[in-house]
């Protein structure tokens, strides 16, 4: 399988000039119209975007993100998705239309199962595949649309329910599903496995070389796509969480170290958490604090990974 690099992408941002309100920049009770003690707008972020706050429905911002992703050697962006007709669903349409003109394509991160359970998940997947699966901007493998499923959603259904959901969807659509789970019993129901965020492992000083190796072997043991996830750093201390988690970026050293360890496990795809999850300080999108450092590092590391 051809090696690919994808990054988790958030389409939940809004500014008054475009969407009429602030969306997500005020996360954690912040006030973007105010200035904080450091002289920056009071955003619910760890760092500050180099081009200022933006709106996920703004084609200009999307084009900038796609251009940066292309420069960094990223093949696809995994866009957060919370349900039919939601803010993120509207933004997805705009992002897909822009991705049609870019080599960087868009898939979705299925975040939550509706209260109706299996039938709701099946309905959501069919909605996504019917409305977006054939869009020229959608990310595919061998012409098969790809969907990632987040751990929260994974936990909302049991194994038998997921088996039934996959059976019903795949009877109608030839799609690829990548599950956020460490269970081989669950991975085998899907087309691959991944981890959204290894920050807990990093913070607890787990042997990441061993972790990546074990996870890749687990996916391969059931003949599925193996993904390895890297982070540039993490800091959710500015959004009012009771329990704060941090992983120091160390000027890019953490990122390079995780790439090297993940690469040794020979995964099929490398995933980056994240392109622009500003709340949790895991972004590689250019910031006032780091400039384009993480795009530059990603370009170097992605190129090396794809050449192995």
Regions found by a protein language model. Give the residues of each.
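Glycan-processing catalytic domains of CAZymes
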Residues: 1-308
